[in-house]
């Protein structure tokens, strides 16, 4: 690999399904899918085995549609305790080779093995890690090897299952630039049409575009993606990164202490909206909601609720926050309110028992929210909003953003 960094991206193959097959070997070689709401057939496929994918069963499609494509499909409800346990074992193994391991999600992570490879060739090291995970846990993975995180991520996607791919900077014109723009890590599915509208059909098109023009069209993300497309990514492998987003929270100090229920409900609604937007931007869902109330005498209380299914939508967050507030409020004037989504999980591993009767409605809501969020992100202020949110933007403009590292966010006075 020459001088410089050597980064691995370790990506487990069809992780949930693979864990289920390791737990029950009789499932191996069969078409299986992990899905929510298996019994009533109205759930969504979270992941599927490669045998099921060969029949067209891919996430996220409704269970009924998956069964139509593959009648012999074996449906398994998610067991997140089992998946978390397997994930912990995988990352413990990776940390045997280097302390520089960054957990991206439950089934993928980066390793900086620059020091480790002084003793062993990168390919041999990757083979050893891959074979150990398979032998000790019966779980397949693919590994990308590159001089930075972006190229390592792209490399790990090039050969699945059980692939090992090296991607050097000198190879990107040949191996990367011809790929369609939708295969580039960092470009969301809903953004693809926008890029194509500007004749950016391949990663190479993006790499050759003018950075200033990209910033004008796509905001600060344009030049960043331009660098990635040219193989430039200076981000370090950060073992602490996983702790940065244990929670996503917002709070606001009210203009004056109040007991006005309508006003307080409006504030909770806007805080829930803010948390939703930030969770969406970070591509996470939460398994719990916490409410913070600070009274006029500065006494602060917190109440929280763990959820059976992860949530991200504003209305879902608001419903839980409102319920917590009604249970906790003692009637005294309130000075501050805060809403936090905690125990977060990457959105691709979150599943909802989606009601198919509301499927089209939810898709429309998601598309509208995406459009509004992109405008806010670009211009830095709420120039567009849904009707019932408009006045709230004016009133709750001192919102404070908090994460698990903002230790004084919920400090009790």
From Swiss-Prot:
A Gene Ontology molecular function term for this protein is: DNA-directed DNA polymerase activity
Subcellular compartments = Cytoplasm
Cross-referenced Pfam families: IMS, IMS_C
Q: Where does the record place the UmuC domain?
A: 7-188
Extract the signal peptide range: none
Q: Which InterPro entries match?
A: DNA/RNA_pol_sf, DNA_pol_Y-fam_lit_finger_sf, DNA_pol_Y-fam_little_finger, DNA_polymerase-Y, DNApol_IV, Rev_trsase/Diguanyl_cyclase, UmuC
Functional description taken from the UniProt entry? Poorly processive, error-prone DNA polymerase involved in untargeted mutagenesis. Copies undamaged DNA at stalled replication forks, which arise in vivo from mismatched or misaligned primer ends. These misaligned primers can be extended by PolIV. Exhibits no 3'-5' exonuclease (proofreading) activity. May be involved in translesional synthesis, in conjunction with the beta clamp from PolIII.
Quaternary assembly: Monomer.
Family as reported in the entry's similarity comment: Belongs to the DNA polymerase type-Y family.
| Protein name per its UniProtKB record | DNA polymerase IV 1
In the UniProt record, the gene name given for this protein reads dinB1
């Amino acid at each position: 690999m020459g001088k410089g960094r050597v980064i691995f991206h370790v990506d487990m193959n069809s992780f949930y399904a693979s864990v289920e097959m390791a737990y029950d070997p009789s499932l191996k070689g069969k078409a299986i899918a992990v899905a929510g709401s298996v019994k009533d057939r109205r759930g969504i496929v979270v992941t599927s085995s490669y045998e099921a994918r060969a029949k067209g069963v891919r996430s996220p499609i409704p269970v009924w549609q998956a069964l139509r494509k593959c009648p012999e499909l074996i449906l398994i409800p998610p067991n997140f305790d089992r998946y978390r346990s397997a994930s912990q074992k995988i990352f413990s193994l990776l940390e045997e080779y280097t302390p520089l391991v960054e957990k991206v999600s439950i089934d993928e992570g980066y390793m900086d093995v620059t020091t480790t490879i002084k003793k062993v060739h990168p390919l041999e090291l990757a083979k050893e890690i891959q074979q150990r995970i398979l032998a000790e846990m019966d779980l397949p993975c693919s590994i990308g090897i590159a001089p930075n995180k972006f190229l390592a991520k792209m490399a790990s996607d090039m050969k699945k299952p059980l692939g090992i791919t090296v991607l050097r900077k000198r190879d990107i014109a040949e191996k990367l630039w011809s790929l369609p723009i939708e295969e580039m890590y960092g470009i969301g599915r809903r953004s693809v049409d926008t890029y194509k509208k500007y004749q950016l059909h391949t990663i190479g098109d993006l790499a050759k575009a003018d950075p200033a023009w990209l910033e004008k069209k796509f905001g600060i993300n344009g030049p960043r993606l331009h660098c990635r497309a040219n193989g430039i990514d200076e981000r370090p492998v950060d073992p602490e990164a996983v702790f940065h987003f244990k929670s996503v929270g917002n709070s606001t100090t009210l203009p004056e202490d109040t007991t006005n229920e309508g006003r307080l409900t409006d504030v909770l609604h806007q805080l829930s909206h803010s948390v939703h937007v930030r969770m969406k931007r970070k591509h996470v869902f939460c398994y719990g909601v916490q409410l913070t109330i600070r009274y006029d005498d500065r006494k602060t209380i917190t109440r929280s609720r763990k959820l059976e299914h992860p949530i991200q939508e504003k209305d879902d967050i608001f419903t839980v926050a409102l319920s917590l507030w009604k249970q906790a409020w003692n009637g005294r004037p309130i000075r501050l309110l805060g809403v936090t989504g905690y125990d977060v999980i990457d959105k691709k591993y979150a599943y909802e028992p989606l009601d198919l009767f509301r499927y089209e409605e939810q898709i429309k809501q998601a598309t509208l929210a995406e459009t509004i969020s992109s405008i806010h992100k670009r211009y830095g202020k709420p120039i567009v909003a849904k009707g019932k949110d408009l006045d709230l933007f004016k009133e709750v403009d001192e919102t404070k953003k908090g994460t698990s590292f903002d230790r004084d966010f919920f400090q009790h006075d």
